[in-house]
Every structure is written in structure tokens, then in C-alpha cells.
């Protein structure tokens, strides 16, 4: 009989912790989820129990982003064996005076939402895209050739490019462009008859006819200067040169251009070359009339 009682006691001793574990798990399931967060990990230290006792639930911890969290002197010097009387005052009471921090920090920043919502990260464009994308009002005014990359644009002079219509420019094929572009860019060279050396007749300079510019033979520079230039070979003003298209302009050799000496361009004034030296008098700057360190009465007496 005694043996039976002993075996029952031993069995109860082994079964007791298992029953406690099962009861704890049932309590864990039935508890409020805010309290369950505190008991998620097994607590082995008494200090940890007291710290968890002061922590807020997770729903209240979100207010820490808006409300500053200060430890009072009572909590700072607190021994973990004794709890403060008012737990809420111990956590929220600020050690910093209200004069240092504005009153806004002690209130929750519940500001009204702005009507204009900020752009999301996907809608915000980078600097390069903002720089490269043309604006809406520029799309209507920018020609198509300028919107193309530089290497795809036609390499034509300005007066030729404007003379071509838009549909003519687009109708040109790629191989036609390659042929036409160098022809348009070439300067105007008049056609002349090429004679062999045996067929050329060299006349003395007095008997030579004064030929046109395109019929004139190739001469040395010092012989060309002897020939009188025609009226049309005279140098036109710069504005007339620019009005005429480039192929129709006459190419004037440099020895026929009207050159001016640097002294004849503008009347040289001696003061422009070397300005007048003005003597610098530092007296009024160093010693003012009414200095600030003397009173007006002393100045009147002196």
C-alpha cells in the first residue's frame, strides 16, 4: 500500500510541470494580443520583468514618433526593485524645461493633410530626364530636324536648308542625301578649259587681253597685281556679301581686298593708351571730419 502511494506521488510530481505548461499555453491563447506581446519571449530576469511593466503596448508606441520621450530623474535614479507610484508620470514627465523646447514638441502633430499630394517616387523624374525632355510649348515650335540627334541631321548650309521644303527634305533617300550634301557644300568654282602646256601661248604682259575672272590664266601673285580689277571685282560691303547666298558670292583674293592699317581704323587717343594718373589722397578716409570717438562739443571748440 505504501509502495502504491509512493508511485502515485512520484507520478504527480512528474506530471505537475507538464500541466502547468499546458495551462500557460491556454492562457497565452486567450490573452489580449497587447499583453501577449510582452510575454512572447521567456523572461529570466526580474529587471526585465520590471522594464516590460513600464513599456507601452504597440498601438501606443507609435505616438513616440510625434511626442518626445523623456526619462524623469525619478526613473533615472530608480532601483529596479522598487516601482514608482505613478507609472505614467514617470515615463512622460520631461526633465527638460518648457522654455528650452517649444510647446509644439509636447503635443501630437496632428496637422491637416494638404490638398496637393506630393509626387510619388515613380512620378518624380531625374535631372537628366528633365533636361532632355522638351517642354509642351516647345514641341509646337521646334522643327523636326532640330529634334533629331545631331548625327542624323542634314549637314547643309542655312540658306540651302531653308530653301528646301519640308516634304522635299523628308522625301530624300539616304543615298541621295549622301550625294547631294557634298555638292551643296562645295564652294562655287567656275568651269574653265584646261589646256596642255604645248597649247598655251604666253604673251607679253602689254599685249595680254584683260579677261574676266573665270577666263583669266593662272599667274603668279606679283603678275596678278598688275592687272586692273573690274568694277564687279571690287570689294562689296560686308552686309551685301551676307545678303547674297554663299555660292553666288565672289571669292576675292586676299591681295585685292581693301586692307586698312590698324592706325586708320579708329582715331587713336593718347589717353586711351595710357589713362590719366589720378593722385590718391587717403587723408579723408583715414581721418574723417567728424570722428566717432570725439563728441561734437569738442569739435566745435577746436
Swiss-Prot record:
Region annotation (16 X approximate tandem repeats) ranges: 144-269
Modification Phosphoserine, positions: 23, 25
A cellular component annotation (GO) from this entry: extracellular region
Tissue-by-tissue expression: Mammary gland specific. Secreted in milk.
Keywords: Milk protein, Phosphoprotein, Repeat, Secreted, Signal
Keyword S-adenosyl-L-methionine: no
Signal peptide range in chain numbering: 1-15
UniProt key word Signal: yes
Family per similarity comment: Belongs to the beta-casein family.
Full protein name: Beta-casein
Organism of provenance: Notamacropus eugenii
Higher taxonomy: Eukaryota, Metazoa, Chordata, Craniata, Vertebrata
